[in-house]
Curated annotation (Swiss-Prot):
InterPro entries noted in UniProt: VlpA-F-like_signal (IPR049890)
Membrane topology: Lipid-anchor
Physiological role: Responsible for the antigenic diversity for host adaptation.
Domain of life: Bacteria
Lipid-binding residues (covalent, N-palmitoyl cysteine): 30
Biased composition (Low complexity): 38-49, 76-97
Protein name: Variant surface antigen B
GO terms under cellular component: plasma membrane
Subcellular location: Cell membrane
Region (Disordered): 32-174
Lipid linkage positions (S-diacylglycerol cysteine): 30
Alphabetical UniProt keywords: Cell membrane, Lipoprotein, Membrane, Palmitate, Repeat, Signal
Amino acid sequence: MKKSIFSKKLLVSFGSLVALASIPLIAISCGQTNTDKSQQPGSGSSTSGGQSGTGLGSGTTTGGQSGTTTGGRSGSGSSSSTTGGQTGTGSDSQDSGAKGTGSDSQDSGAKGTGSDSQDSGAKGTGSDSQDSGAKGTGSDSQDSGAKGTGSDSQDSGAKGTGSDSQDSGNGSTK
């Protein structure tokens, strides 16, 4: 009589542990899909923390079965929830509609004072700058319809006063 009662208690406890182990796994998977879509790192970490505690508590009575199932899956659940949360807040982020202040920037209709900057319709005062319809005062500058006063400058329809200059329709002083 004692053996049958003991075996019934083991079956009931084992069945309840399997049910308890399956509920957190379903909740973890649901929590992962919610955190991936809504990007809420707090909810994923708190649920996985509470469920891993109950998994460890039930794992002490049954031995190795619930420990292996909940241990492996809760580990993957916690790692995926943390990576899902970290994608929202990190370096190398892409922002739209914000002011970017850095080198090698491309501006339109503004005054660019830096190296390797591309400006259109504005005065550029830097080396290796490309300007259209404006006065360029720098080396290796390309100007159209303006007076260029530098070495290796290409001018069209204007007076060139420099070495190695290419002029069209005017007298060259080389």
